[in-house]
């Protein structure tokens, strides 16, 4: 086995272990934020939505800067620094009793993510061969789902005692992750050339095809982020207990572990990437529309199942397509910019979703936010269809098995 092949194989295992630690640290804390501050402390949902939207926008919106800096200086220093910064954000969140302190903690957490997320994504593109990326992204997403359940279970259990324990656990996990990277991650360069920060950013911004694709995905993310805001609140409202939220993530884990890899393996040889992405988005949009009209957990969990199945179909295709479109001369910059759709869509989804949720309650129209999200999903579906029908993306990137 050549040294390059050996590095790729070892890199896969490193990426899987690193991803599990990050997912556990994140999901111990974030699914419980809306329950802690809306249901337990009585804050308006829009206040928590601002905090979550701020974290999302800082992490993903500034990702191009984090990626460009990583292109210049390498992945390791950015990843370690970012993970320590997120640990500090979680520690601050544990003592948040005013909105401004929650917002500050989410700002720190998002800034940390800006530093570590793009280089971690670029490492996947660097280490995994193009023909294997779809399946590897599926493995990462299966891991995400399992980690989400374990993290949510642990966080829900700790929340019975003290929210500070929840935040401390998340902080400790990110400190461990920083140490793991500092110890084992080689000083790899992300790009094929040592790209200056400004040049990497310029290269991305001049790629109109990639920019259009990324911005179109903002609507997709407005739906996707509700697993952190409105869906946990809805489950808690109907069940009357925050403990029920863990079952929402258990559903996601079961569906992901049983369906994600087989669907990706079966569909990658039969359907183009954009068709898989659009099909998943359509299922997600349809499942959103009736959520505000359900009256029991069985109906709600059925719709959540449909939503997750749509995500299982769409996510591997979305990640693979984003990676395929990245220029090897500026991988960090491309993977950083690819998060801008999540920054915009996530911020609008959190803040707008929280505002619509409060408005729906005030007007006695609980279906309002869900109907709006479904409509946004359909508009995004049509926009993606228009984009791909005009062949703005090279055919070789989209063919099955590409």
From Swiss-Prot:
Q: Which residues lie on this side of the membrane: Cytoplasmic?
A: 1-12, 117-138, 186-213, 265-276, 321-339, 389-402
Q: Which GO terms describe its molecular function?
A: transmembrane transporter activity
**Positions of transmembrane segments:** 13-33, 99-116, 139-159, 165-185, 214-234, 244-264, 277-297, 300-320, 340-360, 368-388
Keywords, A to Z?
Answer: Cell inner membrane, Cell membrane, Membrane, Transmembrane, Transmembrane helix, Transport
Q: Does the keyword Membrane apply?
A: yes
Which membrane topology term applies here?
Multi-pass membrane protein
Pfam short name (any one): MFS_1
Name where it's found. Cell inner membrane
PROSITE patterns for the chain: MFS (PS50850)
What Gene3D superfamilies has UniProt attached to this entry? MFS general substrate transporter like domains
Q: Which residues lie on this side of the membrane: Periplasmic?
A: 34-98, 160-164, 235-243, 298-299, 361-367
- Please give the GO cellular component terms listed in this UniProt entry: plasma membrane
Q: What HAMAP family does the record tag this protein with? A: MFS_MdtH
| Listed PANTHER family | MULTIDRUG RESISTANCE PROTEIN MDTH, RESISTANCE PROTEIN MDTM, PUTATIVE-RELATED-RELATED
Concerning its family, UniProt says: Belongs to the major facilitator superfamily. DHA1 family. MdtH (TC 2.A.1.2.21) subfamily.
Q: What is this protein called?
A: Multidrug resistance protein MdtH
Q: Which organism is it from?
A: Salmonella gallinarum (strain 287/91 / NCTC 13346)
